[in-house]
Amino acid sequence: MKDAVKKYWAVALMFLMVTAVCLLFSCRKSGMFIDEIYTYGLSNSSYAPYITDIKGGNALGQVITREELFDYVAVTEGEGFDFGSVYYNQAMDVHPPLYYWLFNAVSSLVPGTFSKWTGLALDYVIYMLALLCLYKLVKELFGSRDIACAAVILYGLSLLGLSTMLMIRMYVLLTMLSLLLAYLIARLLRDFRPRLCPLVGLTILAGLMTQYYFVFYAFFLCGAYVLYVLGKKEYKKLLHFVPWALGGALCLLLAFPDCIHQLTADKLVSGGNAMENLTNLSQYPQRLLYYFGEVRHGLKAAILVTMVALLALVLLFKKVKTAAGEKSLCLDSLVVILPAFVTLPVVAILSPVLDQRYIYNIVPFFVVAVCLLLYWLRLALEGRERSALISKAVLLAIAALALWQARCVPPAYLYPEYRDYDALVEQHADEPCVYFTDNYFSPMTQDLLQLLHFEDFYVTDENGCGEMLDYLGDCGEFVAYIDISETWSSGYDPEEIIANIRDNTDYDKAELLYQNGLSATYVIAK
């Protein structure tokens, strides 16, 4: 027992620190991004991918009740573990179904519940598995428990890492599977065993069944491994590896044939859009600068460690050179590291919108690159008096730096402003609510958390001011949500909608309650 404590106390401490920070920010999460609400709806609704499908695809002129909204995002009695519905919903969407199956399974364990904690609990478990894969990967590559712990804390408490966990979406699973694939490749690098090749194939299939962007890192990683093996002229290894890797990718067509339509569709999130971005050379600089900036901002602690490590390596160059003549520099770790650096510009160019989530799965490998520098430093210091103590001191200093970064810059997807939105809406929860849109589900999905405050709401378009009067009855005021996004939905001008209401009804006063992305919310009164 004492030996176990001595060996693993640092490992346990790093994971506990990450857990504590994850819990802290989970408690602070006050709202959800629209895609997070899609996660609940696509996973838990019964053969109704989007809110408008609650009303057969056309919500105009209809009333949507709180119960119908709740049924869209929660597993209700008798609907648990309905994986067929999840498969159908994802076939209608733009992503494969693996994460949504897991989400539905977790939601089915707590039927009748709609809470951020359902998604955060699942994401936390997957995040811990991702950190475990990262730990095992670095330990396999560099043979140092302390360096592996440094990787866990540098990534686990990074802005990008915590954002991955806090976004209730498939990206945390995508990251875990990318790390698992890298770990399997690392195992093959160090001790090739044919029985690992089927696991490579299964991991590739699982990654593609999670998010199509898995293909980029997986392709470059497998390609780097093949080139490495060819360089060593160990051709027999490829007879085991290549069929399983290709088979895993091709099995996607059997497991989810709708992927063909999704990848070739002419939508914003599709293969068609990716090809448009590829041919639009003028946007390359903007896209590359954005994503490089996200990495620089989201891995500040790792970058600081890199700068210090490089300076130390320059000062200790002679000792590193001497150590390199006696021990391996672990340059084969570049098989795992370099594909991430190649994937970054590819994703930057092809991503449907500029958003950090598209690079979440490759972020850990930038930390692995930092660990390579730490390994070289370890070689230079090895054999010195109290080298083990120095190693632990460096690890604790890195942990303190990572904690400082997490304290200074909060991760994404917390939405503190949603507390104010909820408070404002709650003041008017007893009043009628009207949603103005051209039957677009996106803005209503974004506003679902606030719409749940109302008993029901009426959906109409810009010309439906007269038709809504039957719904409003003789009330003195009502809440109006106006769909304002020109990119994602109707793009209404609120002033025109309000003027139309004044011209066709007795309601002549309007006060802006708040504005949130795709919609503006007003209180309309007589």
Positions of PLM-derived features:
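Transmembrane-helix motifs of polytopic, lipid-linked glycan transferases
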Residues: 118-142, 180
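Interfacial juxtamembrane loops and adjacent helix segments
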Residues: 44-95, 107-112
